[in-house]
Amino acid sequence: MRVLILAKEGERSETGTPPTPEAMAEHQTFNEELVKAGVVIGSGRLTPSAQGKRVTFDGKKRTVIDGPFAETKELVAGYWLWQVRSIDEAIEWLKRAPYDGGSFEIREVSMSEGA
């Protein structure tokens, strides 16, 4: 099954401050383990919401809103796309992740036709 892992953070992701070299090394090691196990399909870190846009839909009306999106307590800061046997396997991998804050949301990717 494919799952999308959404990394959610608060203010820390909005500052654009890079992690310490030690934290970067820990993240790199963890990502290498995921790749070696054949779990990772794709991944990425997102820029702060100040650089983003939001498009809202109301019937036929489309509205573009410039970031930052300060009204949101948690923002998506990054993602992984994984191939795993089960949600439980994804949870076990996430428990090993070298993070000291934020949260992760695991969502199964629908493989239905037309999706």
List where the protein language model places each region.
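Conserved, structured core segments of small domains
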Residues: 1-115
